[in-house]
């Protein structure tokens, strides 16, 4: 199965109950995900001999399968496809939260080059920045999971100035949108989320 998937440029995912470390090692997995969400399984004989994984790539500890699946798929897909030397568009922002205005800007960024790097400013949490950086990244990964490999998301310092010399080989551009898109307000979105108890 794995050989055929690799020949077709695809990724094979296998789900096993494998209580022994040496048995798991025989799969020669590129990435190992440990779903660690229960104290014991329903099979007593498996519980008795179970050996916890020593080292895994991902350790899922909460019952939020859809969320974790999207995040893990995004991260693994990115490793296979992202090309650091390919022409890339950069977007810098707080994304508190990611909204249709950001999406419209992102769509234009993708149209300029084949991949986009999203830089999340690491802000102190307050009313205007309710999400810590790691939660912003999770939200972005869920929103953009279908573009894994074409989008890279990074936390950067709280950047307030960007300086450059002449002849640098890249452009800094402001995108202009229609009034409906331009008027999308993250402040109003946060206020509505608070009213609905989502924030």
Regions found by a protein language model. Name each.
Residues 15, 34-36, 60-62, 119-120:
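Conserved beta-strand segments of the P-loop GTPase G domain that flank and frequently precede/overlap
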Residues 31, 47-84:
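NTP-dependent small-molecule kinase module
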Residues 32-34, 57-60, 89, 116:
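Short, well-ordered beta-strand core segments
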Residues 40-50, 68-72, 182-188:
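Short, charged, surface-exposed secondary-structure boundary motifs
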């Amino acid at each position: 199965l794995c050989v055929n998937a690799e020949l077709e440029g695809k990724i094979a995912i296998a789900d096993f109950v494998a209580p022994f470390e040496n048995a798991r090692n025989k799969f020669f997995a590129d990435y190992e995900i440990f779903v660690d969400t229960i104290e014991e399984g329903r099979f007593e004989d498996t519980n008795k001999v179970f050996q916890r994984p020593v080292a895994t790539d991902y350790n899922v500890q909460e019952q939020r399968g859809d969320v974790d699946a999207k995040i893990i798929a995004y991260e693994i897909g990115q490793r296979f496809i992202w090309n650091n030397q390919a022409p890339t568009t950069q977007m810098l922002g707080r994304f508190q939260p990611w909204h249709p205005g950001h999406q419209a800007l992102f769509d234009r960024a993708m149209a300029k080059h084949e991949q986009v790097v999203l830089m999340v400013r690491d802000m102190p949490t307050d009313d205007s920045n309710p999400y810590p950086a790691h939660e912003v990244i999770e939200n972005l990964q869920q929103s953009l999971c279908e573009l894994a490999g074409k989008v890279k998301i990074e936390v950067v310092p709280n950047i307030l100035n960007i300086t450059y010399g002449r002849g640098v080989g890249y452009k800094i551009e402001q995108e202009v949108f229609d009034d409906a898109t331009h008027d999308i307000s993250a402040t109003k979105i946060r206020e509505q989320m608070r009213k609905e108890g989502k924030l």
